[in-house]
């Protein structure tokens, strides 16, 4: 099984990411609709800079987060935990990803919030549909492993 492909297929079917940032001794989390790009292994989202999490992020920050479904039974639990970096996009890169975001979420056409990229360095995918407690791990610098 191609671990990253399996993770990517599942992430492409979801739409809400929880991401957390810190500054000094303060932590804060936010939720956002996202577009997942399997080529860059990254999430793209819109978020205002004036929010608490936007202020804490600045132009770039370390980030951790989750994506999870809402299954009715333990046997169907699937979810991702990740850590990496979040950065604000600009110029052509922002325009390109905004276009892709608006294609998936047409209501976003009305929003002027900046586009952000969450680029995970590490992903852990729990997939109980493959067996209770089955974990797939991916690291940007190392590829894939299973547990």
Swiss-Prot record:
The organism's place on the tree of life at top rank: Bacteria
Gene3D superfamilies xrefs: Electron Transport, Fmn-binding Protein, Chain A
InterPro entries: Split_barrel_FMN-bd, UPF0306
Residue ranges of the TM segments: none
SUPFAM superfamilies: FMN-binding split barrel (SSF50475)
Family that this chain belongs to: Belongs to the UPF0306 family.
HAMAP family the UniProt entry points to: UPF0306
NCBIfam families to which the protein is assigned, alphabetical: PRK03467.1
Name the UniProt record assigns to this protein: UPF0306 protein KPN78578_35330
Source species of the chain: Klebsiella pneumoniae subsp. pneumoniae (strain ATCC 700721 / MGH 78578)
Record lineage: Bacteria, Pseudomonadati, Pseudomonadota, Gammaproteobacteria, Enterobacterales
């Amino acid at each position: 099984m191609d671990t990253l492909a399996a993770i990517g297929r599942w992430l492409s079917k979801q739409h809400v990411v929880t991401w957390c940032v810190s500054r000094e001794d303060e932590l804060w989390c936010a939720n956002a609709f996202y577009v997942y790009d399997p080529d860059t292994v990254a999430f793209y989202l819109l978020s205002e800079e004036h929010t608490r999490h936007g202020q804490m992020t600045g132009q770039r920050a370390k980030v951790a987060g989750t994506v999870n479904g809402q299954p009715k039974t333990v046997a169907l639990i699937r979810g991702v935990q990740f850590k990496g970096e979040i950065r604000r996009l600009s110029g052509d890169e922002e325009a390109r990803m905004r276009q892709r975001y608006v294609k998936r979420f047409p209501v976003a056409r009305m929003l002027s919030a900046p586009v952000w990229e969450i680029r995970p360095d590490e992903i852990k995918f729990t997939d109980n549909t493959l067996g209770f407690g089955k974990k797939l791990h991916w690291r940007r610098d190392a590829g894939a492993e299973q547990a």
